[in-house]
Amino acid sequence: MKIHRWNDTFIVPRGAYFEGHVHIEGDLLVPRDTHFWGRLVVEGDLTLGPRSTVGAGVWCANAIVGDHVRIRGPLVAVGDVLACDGAAIGMIRAARDVTLRPGVRVGDVVSGRTILVQGKVESGRLLGRMVKVVGATLP
């Protein structure tokens, strides 16, 4: 599978799938319907497009997880994490802020700063310096 490179950003073609573990030295943009059957390690920022899947854990600097993405293992970030509507994640561990949008299903969430829960989510324990829960009316 050919991955396109633009400066320090790697771009995966839509609908691609990867059978083994993937390690990217830079940022990674993943379009919708892309599948990783193994572990995904990104040394920069990760943007996972809608309806993508990761069969094992994800390690990255910052993460934006698109709607209805499924990550079967943990998501570990040294920065911020945004989990969009309907995402399913094994667990989240972030050094900075975590935002959970409506419909997210996640195990435990551990944050070094703030956990912002927008709307109704299914989760295990929420551990952070501050946990804010607001209605689903925010964009």
Give, region by region, the residue ranges found by the protein language model.
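Extended beta-solenoid/beta-helix repeat architectures
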Residues: 1-139
